[in-house]
Amino acid sequence: MTFNDKLQAYIQLTRFDKPVGIELLLWPTLWGVLFAAMGQAQQQGAGITAGLPSLSIFVIFALGAILMRAAGCAINDFADRKVDGHVSRTKGRPLADGRLSAKEAIAAFLVLVLLSASLLLFLPIQVFYWSFGAVILAFIYPFMKRYTHLPQVFLAAAFGWAIPMAYVAIQGAPDIWCWLLFLAYMCWTVAYDTQYAMADREDDIKIGVKSTAILFDRYDVIIISLLQTLFLVIMGAVMWHYFAPTSLGITPVFGLALVAMMFAKQNSACASRNALACFKAFLANIWVGRYVFVLIAIACIWTTFNG
């Protein structure tokens, strides 16, 4: 293989050529950063109701999300290297078609984890301790689909772990609102990753891979809808907590109505159980992440300067 061929294989291994996954991790991480900064400002009292995170914190967590998502993809392909070749959507992955070896995938995972760890040098030491949870969850998640029908829960925990880390970095420790935000993220992630699994359900059944799509069976869309509803309710409560004391009041909460409409459209598509329709519904969640980030960011900026 030429250098360019090998480089392309590594890019595909880490999914840098497919930014959808990056966004699904990046935006919720930044939700956590923004809310943690709001909480820190409100804890100071003296009538302060809002605040923004420092640019350095923002950049560190954004880079960390990008690198750890890439690391997660590398270890996922390592875990699935013997089954990806039997799934039409994944048979072209670099480990499945032999362009990269298992050792090269592990090496890529370790390099990306070390690069992510280097960012911790600029954060309080407590964040370093919390980061072990992220690494452990990212490593074990890909293997869970062999033993449980709930690998999506492990994925959600692995990707969502950046939220308590953001609170530790900014506030010193996670609080109840941090964990509610984490729970909301878990609900949303299990919902959209079930949509993703619905696209592969027939192949997964044939090769013995487990997923929530298989577990939920004909109740899949109903349970996805319930999880999305929980996300909206919990996220609404979190927004109420942070923005009710400000000049905006509960106005940002009403902004979640558009998310509800997005979810309704997704579920209408998934009701057909068509693999392509389910995959497109999954992809549509990047707009949920983007929109909620913009909603929170605008509210935080407005309240920081207008009270």
Curated annotation (Swiss-Prot):
Disulfide bonds: none annotated. Its cofactor is Mg(2+). InterPro entries: HB_polyprenyltransferase-like, Prenyltransferase, UbiA_prenyltransferase, UbiA_sf. Pathway: Cofactor biosynthesis; ubiquinone biosynthesis. It comes from the Bacteria. GO terms for molecular function: 4-hydroxybenzoate polyprenyltransferase activity. It catalyses: all-trans-octaprenyl diphosphate + 4-hydroxybenzoate = 4-hydroxy-3-(all-trans-octaprenyl)benzoate + diphosphate. Its EC number is 2.5.1.39. It holds the Pfam family UbiA. The chain crosses the membrane at residues 19-39, 48-68, 105-125, 127-147, 150-170, 172-192, 221-241, 243-263, 282-302. CDD domains: PT_UbiA_COQ2. It is a multi-pass membrane protein. It is found in: Cell inner membrane. GO terms for cellular component: plasma membrane. Gene3D superfamilies: UbiA prenyltransferase (1.20.120.1780). GO terms for biological process: ubiquinone biosynthetic process. Keywords: Cell inner membrane, Cell membrane, Magnesium, Membrane, Transferase, Transmembrane, Transmembrane helix, Ubiquinone biosynthesis. HAMAP family: UbiA. PANTHER family: 4-HYDROXYBENZOATE POLYPRENYLTRANSFERASE, MITOCHONDRIAL, PRENYLTRANSFERASES. Belongs to the UbiA prenyltransferase family. Catalyzes the prenylation of para-hydroxybenzoate (PHB) with an all-trans polyprenyl group. Mediates the second step in the final reaction sequence of ubiquinone-8 (UQ-8) biosynthesis, which is the condensation of the polyisoprenoid side chain with PHB, generating the first membrane-bound Q intermediate 3-octaprenyl-4-hydroxybenzoate. This is 4-hydroxybenzoate octaprenyltransferase. It comes from Psychrobacter cryohalolentis (strain ATCC BAA-1226 / DSM 17306 / VKM B-2378 / K5). The gene is ubiA.
